[in-house]
Amino acid sequence: MFRGVYEHQIDAKGRTSLPAKLRDTLVGAYDERLILTTALDRCLHAYPVREWEALELSLAKRNPMEPGVKTLMRLYVASAQECPLDKLGRLLIPPTLRSYAGLEKEVVWAGMVKVIELWSREGWAKAQEEARQEATSADVMKVLAELRQA
């Protein structure tokens, strides 16, 4: 499971290092490949290939003309690109994905259980502030209570 928040630099070529703890989880449970795609928030999602393929298989069983399915395919699947780690544990983020998420000099990696989010530093700060405002909502508290009982 991916967890934790890590700040890293991104170089002029668009490479950034996958944080060691996230890399250990990736290599230990999967392999050294990630699928990067645009998220609905202004960030990127990084899936281990096996998790991504499971998502695609589930999606393939759905009616592609269903509005939510078609939109998900256009926004999420069509943008997806496989990005293997190099020998130094770096990931080359394609220019279109960097542009979408506003990744320039600093990136924030956020472990989200089965997926990793990549944010610009500013985007992450804004998302955290929004999450803190929502954290007091009844819906969030209900989910947390359900998880504690499971």
Curated annotation (Swiss-Prot):
Keyword terms of this UniProt record: Cytoplasm, DNA-binding, Repeat, Transcription, Transcription regulation
Cited PANTHER family: TRANSCRIPTIONAL REGULATOR MRAZ
Annotated source species: Myxococcus xanthus (strain DK1622)
Gene: mraZ
Assembly, per entry: Forms oligomers.
GO biological process: negative regulation of DNA-templated transcription initiation
Source organism phylogeny: Bacteria, Pseudomonadati, Myxococcota, Myxococcia, Myxococcales
Annotated family: Belongs to the MraZ family.
Name of the protein described by the UniProt record: Transcriptional regulator MraZ
Pfam families named in the record: MraZ (PF02381)
Subcellular locations according to the entry: Cytoplasm, Nucleoid
Main location as per UniProt: cytoplasm
Domain of life assignment: Bacteria
InterPro entries recorded: MraZ, MraZ_C, MraZ_dom, MraZ_N, MraZ_sf, SpoVT-AbrB_dom, SpoVT-AbrB_sf
One cellular-component annotation, GO: cytoplasm
GO molecular function list: DNA-binding transcription factor activity; transcription cis-regulatory region binding
Stored HAMAP family: MraZ (MF_01008)
SpoVT-AbrB domain span: 5-51, 80-123
